[in-house]
Amino acid sequence: MTYCSKANQPSYPFILPDLPYDKESFKPHFTRETFDYHHGKHHNSYVQNLNNLIKDREELQKKDLEEIIEWSSQNAEVAILNNASQIWNHTFFWYSIKPHGGGKPSGKVFEQISKDFGSFEQFCAQFKQEAVGQFGSGWTWVVYHDNKLQIIKTSNAGTPIVNFMKPILACDVWEHAYYIDYRNKRSDYIDIFIRHMINWKFVEDNLIQ
């Protein structure tokens, strides 16, 4: 099963994927510098680390990224798991946002949110509570699991796909995602994420696939 074809990569050597938008396009909410560091340095370092970790592991070089995540999670290969997961998580995150995004969704996503959370406002409140409340670095996710939407948190490089949960939205709450522009104000960052950044088309595509 492929959880997200846009986040997956077919085989070694893995590459840093291009951003699906210009780095300047999130102004005034985020500066180019944030994307230069977040994508060009942090995300890229995970790609380089994983390639170095498996450069002599022919059995792993034939696997796609999601297969490496699954295999390493089952075989206590922590360094491989952490770097592979962070490549996948970040790529999924880049598609979870778009310039001039956010606001209220429509269609199937809005219907499912209303069904599972009571209202869009309640969903936003719970999402913000979970994201702001994540202790230390990690991720906040919306997943479709057990026939309903759920908001979950993962610490550090954790990813829901190791628990066979289907992610439909990711929010990076590592400090490097927002510290250049928002310093320690994670709450402000989450407000901007919800109001101006969520790519609801990507969310809907994940939900209905």
From Swiss-Prot:
Residues the entry annotates as binding Fe(3+): H38, H90, D172, H176
Cofactor(s) needed by this chain: Mn(2+); Fe(3+)
Entry-linked InterPro entries: Mn/Fe_SOD, Mn/Fe_SOD_BS, Mn/Fe_SOD_C, Mn/Fe_SOD_N, Mn/Fe_SOD_N_sf, SOD_C_sf
Residues noted as binding Mn(2+) in the record, renumbered to the chain: H38, H90, D172, H176
EC numbers, comma separated: 1.15.1.1
The reaction(s) this protein catalyses: 2 superoxide + 2 H(+) = H2O2 + O2
Residue pairs linked by disulfide bridges in the UniProt entry: none
GO molecular function, one term: metal ion binding
Source domain of life: Bacteria
SUPFAM superfamilies: Fe,Mn superoxide dismutase (SOD), C-terminal domain, Fe,Mn superoxide dismutase (SOD), N-terminal domain
Keyword Repeat (UniProt): no
Any matching Pfam family: Sod_Fe_N
EC class (word): oxidoreductase
Metal-binding listed as a keyword: yes
Keywords assigned by UniProt, alphabetized: Iron, Manganese, Metal-binding, Oxidoreductase
Cofactor: binding comment: Binds 1 Mn(2+) or Fe(3+) ion per subunit.
PANTHER family the record matches: SUPEROXIDE DISMUTASE (PTHR42769), SUPEROXIDE DISMUTASE [FE] 2, CHLOROPLASTIC (PTHR42769:SF3)
Function of the protein: Destroys superoxide anion radicals which are normally produced within the cells and which are toxic to biological systems. Catalyzes the dismutation of superoxide anion radicals into O2 and H2O2 by successive reduction and oxidation of the transition metal ion at the active site.
Recorded family membership: Belongs to the iron/manganese superoxide dismutase family.
Protein name: Superoxide dismutase [Mn/Fe]
Organism: Rickettsia prowazekii (strain Madrid E)
